[in-house]
Amino acid sequence: VHRRIIVPGALGAASVLLAIPASAAAPSPGAPGIGDPYYPAYGNGGYDVSHYDLRLTYRPDSDRLEGTATILARTTEDLSRFNLDFLLDVGEVRVNGAKASFTTSGEHELEITPKRPLAKGTPVTVVVRYGGVPSSKEAYGFTGWHRTPDGGVAANEPEAAWWWFPSNDHPLDKATFDVSVQVPDGTQAISNGTLRSKSSRSVFDLTTGTTESGIPVVNAYSVDLGANDGAARASVERTGEVADWLSGYFGPYPYNALGGYVPNTDTGYALETQTRPFYSPRQFANGSNVSVVVHELAHQWYGDLVSVRGWKDIWINEGFARYAQWLWSEHEGEGTARELADYTYASHPADDPFWTVRPGDPGPENQFDIAVYDRGALAVHALREKVGDEDFFAILKGWPAKYAHGNASVADFRRYAEEVSGEPLAALFDTWLFRPSKPEAPAARAASLAKAADTPAQPRSWRKIAATNDVHAH
């Protein structure tokens, strides 16, 4: 376990050096949101987190979770107080060693007032002791914590942290994590990243392997998946193979751990939790589905390595993860990307509400609408036809490297694609991502469609791809 030690004497000296001069404006409360117009209360202002250390104890029988979160951050403005996003009951908060007062507000705000104001640029250590029953908590009428027969799962987007640790919960504030979970013997806890140690008897069936580049792969399956067990394993066990294949398009796999897990939960979606995607057993109710594994692993580059600047930029995540499925279909001989584009385009007449959703800015109510995925992938294919394969695949691989471990917007992607291809792309992006109407088919697709008297034949891969359409619903 990695630990970071802050020497009290050094911290005290820093506090003196950074003391607010008498002539400065009085410190003010940090904003209760990071500034995302889709979700104004998500994330918080006034500080930037670098690391979370989470020490947790969980009782599966009662769903009782107790924890101590140590948060390392630095202020970005003079603060009289600041917020964390959190739902469980808080017993104590300390800021730089001193007890702080706290209260709650809104749906998920923990307001913390330190003993003394914090000057801009101050290193801050926040310790929060807490406990509660995550499954008993709701915000905005839903929960991101899902009970299973033997425990619980925290997996949701764009929010899930509130149910198990206090945080600045928005992709703009990236941080590293150490997670330690104590559970009763016969129970296991699974999280992201590299496993440091374990001492409990297994209730998950763990399988291990490595990718061709030597990345360790750990997959976990609940022992009570029933009829879905075989199909789940036949899909998720190909994780290493799929990651190696995606590396050919997106560049080297960006992390030092890899895997997937399938708990016995009644949710219907999968989620690209970093390094170890979550899959619902229902994803495999109709047999194996490697396509959903492709989708979630594509997000390790498009969504995790490079994250959205704001949630309106969701097309960069979902359009490219869907297009990765189209490329996999081609790889498996089950339909080319063009055939899938033709079928998708022809399947939705001009008056279909599908075309009213704008993937480049869909609004929070349509953030995970099927059009963000399928029309989003059509936009990716239109880009490919516009710039040609050489530049297209250079863009596909270069983008994750350019913005690695950062955030970017749809506008950033357009500028990058123009830089690589030398083509003006504003009109294409406007047509496929922002107009609430069915675009004219590109010349290549129009010619292809003209040869077919009726709707093009459904590619063999279509049903498996469509089975991922519930991926992120609450």
Per-region residue spans from a language model:
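Extended, low-hydrophobicity, Ser/Thr/Pro/Gly-biased non-transmembrane segments
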Residues: 43, 127-200
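N-terminal, polar/Ser/Thr-rich
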Residues: 2-8, 12-20, 24-66, 146, ...
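Zinc-dependent metallopeptidase catalytic helix centered on the HExxH motif
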Residues: 233, 275-341
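Long, His/Glu/Asp-enriched segments that create or flank divalent metal/ion-associated functional microenvironments
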Residues: 439, 443-474
